[in-house]
Structure formats: C-alpha cells, structure tokens
C-alpha cells in the first residue's frame, strides 16, 4: 500500500476525495465487499492472536491504522515534502518512510 501511495499518489488522492465527498460512487462496495474482506482478514489475525503469534489488538482498527499510515504519504505529500525538504520523493526518503511504517506495524503486532 505504501508503494502504491508513492508510485500513484494521484490515484490515492482521487479515492480519498471520493470518500471525503460521501463515497457516493463506492459506498455500496465499501459496505459489502470491503466490509467482508476486512472481517475475513481480521478473523485471520484474531486466530494468530489466539495462538500467541501476535499481540492482542483490535484487528479491525489495525487495518484503519495501516491505511492511515500509508495513505498519508499520498494525500499529504506536499506537507511531507515541506517538512522533509526537497529530497522527500527520493528513493532513499521513500525507503526511510517504508521502514518506519513497517517498524510501527511490527511493534503493534508484537513482532519487533
């Protein structure tokens, strides 16, 4: 997801704008297909938690957290560039961001 945010930020922003405007086009898919997909994936994570492979967490909200961490790099790339400077779009800067997001995810999951 973060790679997509770097590679296609305009597509990510288009989706975000659709959501911010009430999701009139995609709302039926969000309520059905996305809801079902998240529930299925959350059940898998819940199973891993029950086996002691992951730290206890709200697995549905875990997806929101990952989405927000990755979506930010597309939706707020101008803000990020202003804070980080001109090299924010470099491969090194993108790798730094990816490494940070992954460390956060591992930490949430208790896998660090």
Where are these regions (language model features)?
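Short, solvent-exposed amphipathic helices
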Residues: 29-33
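A local structural micro-motif
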Residues: 13, 56-57
